[in-house]
């Protein structure tokens, strides 16, 4: 208790020193995206009005008196004990389910409302004063010993981080995010700290805070380490509940042992995951989730889990580790099918996987060029021709393999769209634009492959098609790239035609 009191005193002192300096800052009300509320949507069950109890009809006959039964007191006593026992058990489970959802103390609620008012347009977005009030609200929570993992406590800390960002105090915001992440990570790793029924929600909050913190992160290697650390924690949680994921790892282990025995590439049996077996349709042709799949092991944090995996892929690309990005994406697509993710997201991930295979092929092409340059610089006596030939064959084989797999990924999305033509009619009705974007991206990807092979007329047509689709879906990033590649193709066609003449 003494140690707890000292920590609380230090925390309050630190905040008060900081709050006293806030009013001296200049305000920079730049627009920054608001944080999402980390709480699950509240149930409106308790707000429903109960129906009145109907009264007995006026002329209904009176019920005859029941004859008294022996040992009635004893039976009533037993019944009373049973009711008390059930009530105690019910109260215990109610307390456990609401332990992370405790309400703010009244003193903190008052300051919280004042802080919200200060950051509103009514007070000209006074973020400095709002920050001071949020810190004060957190102090009130500490004095009332509010659970540091509770939704309300975490929400106040996230609002403080948001104010830091709006005041361009990114280092302070990042430090607060790190403090939150450390607290959640420690709680999830200490046995009994988080109740089993609450682990999913706590993991969900942990991943959301992680994703938010990475929006202002500038250190790529640090970001990768954080992602890996928290993703492995979530993965272990899924593994403990999902027979499918256990089977996945067992099959991977068997495959690797077979590869060692017969000296094969572990990815020789690469297959795509876009098929009618994995993606279902309703009677009107709308893509739907497969309700027969049991994806409960991935709930309630599967959206956050796959967003974090995509971020890890992006960080790998930023650090030029294309092989790691590719490996992560292959696994992600397969797991998205297991987790019964929205069909459009599976399609888009498959198309993105094709792009990663093409990037890897480009890297291997650059490696081939380096080998050839090395050969031209060194004499035959200095160069070990046997080693050189082996290296060239290995790199060339892997490059061709990556190009082949990129085509498989793009082809699977386009062929799937052709086989299920109703997708085209419903593209504009879909709330999720990823379906149309995946088709546009795959069409563009096939154009890039055709350009790489020198089939200019086909490449030109595919680029034009992808531009049309990108405009329809407002896929501006793809639109810019497709227009650039179309211009390049047009120049090459003109040069080729001039050369023939």
Swiss-Prot record:
The TPR repeat ranges on this chain: 109-144, 154-187, 386-420, 440-473
Q: Which GO terms describe its cellular component?
A: i-AAA complex; mitochondrial inner membrane; mitochondrion
Enumerate the Mitochondrial intermembrane topological stretches.
96-501
Give TM regions: 78-95
Describe, as the record does, how this protein assembles with itself and its partners. Answer: Component of the mitochondrial inner membrane i-AAA protease supercomplex composed of MGR1, MGR3 and YME1. With MGR1, forms a subcomplex that binds to YME1 and to substrates to facilitate proteolysis.
Tell me, which GO biological process terms does this entry list?
mitochondrial protein quality control; protein catabolic process; protein import into mitochondrial intermembrane space; protein quality control for misfolded or incompletely synthesized proteins
Which InterPro entries does UniProt cross-reference here? Answer: Mrg3-like
Q: Which family does it belong to?
A: Belongs to the MGR3 family.
Function statement:
Component of the mitochondrial inner membrane i-AAA protease supercomplex, which degrades misfolded mitochondrial proteins. Together with MGR1, functions in an adapter complex that targets substrates to the i-AAA protease for degradation. Required for growth of cells lacking the mitochondrial genome.
Q: Which UniProt keywords apply?
A: Membrane, Mitochondrion, Mitochondrion inner membrane, Repeat, TPR repeat, Transmembrane, Transmembrane helix
Region Disordered: list its residue ranges. 39-72
Q: Name one GO molecular function term.
A: misfolded protein binding
UniProt-annotated location(s) = Mitochondrion inner membrane
User: Extra notes?
Assistant: Present with 8970 molecules/cell in log phase SD medium.
What name has this protein been given in UniProt? Answer: Mitochondrial inner membrane i-AAA protease supercomplex subunit MGR3
Source organism's superkingdom? Eukaryota
